[in-house]
Amino acid sequence: MKYTVRIIISIAFLFSFSYVKSQNYHNIESNFSLDDLSISVKQKSNYVNQTSNKLSNIIIYDWNNSYSSIDSPLSKKLYSEYDSSILKSNSNQRGKTVISKILVNDKIVKWKRIPNHNDLIEIQLNQEIDSEERIVISFEYDLYIPNFVLNYGHKNNFINLKNCFLRFSPFINNQWLILSNQGLDDQFMVKSNITLKINYDSELHLVSNLDKKASYLSGNILSETYKGTLISDIFLILTDDQEFKKLSLNKINILTNSLSLIH
């Protein structure tokens, strides 16, 4: 089934809480499975304390897990707006993030999901980090993609994902921004440099706002590398619709399968 979808991503004017120069980066290695609609991820994230405070914890956004529970802030918002699509889904259809490992500078740390915010993770650092100090956080986790809700998820070999990978919360006014995903466009991601390596079935077509740097076919698996500088949001579309394209118009990236735009 083909979807007539046009997603416009404004790079020049996208508002976010971020720094002009990012010292944060995410190196993400991922494998997409069409069989169970999951993405296994190994991620190394470089974090520099750009505040004037000593930090004893780090807050991570896990937007994919917003869809995992009928008690999540996102589900409650949908219910209040008379959208019961998540409530009607069973647990396998709602999607979730399963984290198997979090290390800071190669050492085990304690972490938890913040009460009443199942899409926020608090990492307790083994020792405080000073201003301008750098740490490397290693994650291993699996993303299970939910049924299509609020333009996120999967339906009939069409998969649309926005900010599915783990990202840093902004630190504003001497505190972390504790803000759950509510399905809005104004998701406050810290601008970061991104390297994404993804393996997926070659019968699918991947489009992203990131720049493709390499592509390699081995059997029926495509291995591709994407990069982005000072990126707020990461958009991924996996589809069997080969007409999806990425266009750049006046510093605005457009992901579209609208023939009137492509031709």
Regions inferred by a protein language model and the residue ranges of each:
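Juxtacatalytic substrate-recognition/specificity segment
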Residues: 196, 247-263
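Short Pro-Gly-centered flexible turn/kink motifs
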Residues: 130-139
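Extended, low-hydrophobicity, Ser/Thr/Pro/Gly-biased non-transmembrane segments
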Residues: 82-96, 100, 113, 140-237, ...
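Bacterial N-terminal signal peptides that target proteins for export
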Residues: 1-9
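Hydrophobic alpha-helical and helix-loop surface patches within well-folded domains
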Residues: 6, 22-24, 62, 226, ...
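Ligand-binding face of N-terminal immunoglobulin V-set domains in extracellular IgSF glycoproteins
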Residues: 40-66, 71, 80-83
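Bacterial N-terminal signal peptides
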Residues: 8-16
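N-terminal, polar/Ser/Thr-rich
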Residues: 15, 19-40, 48-54, 157-159
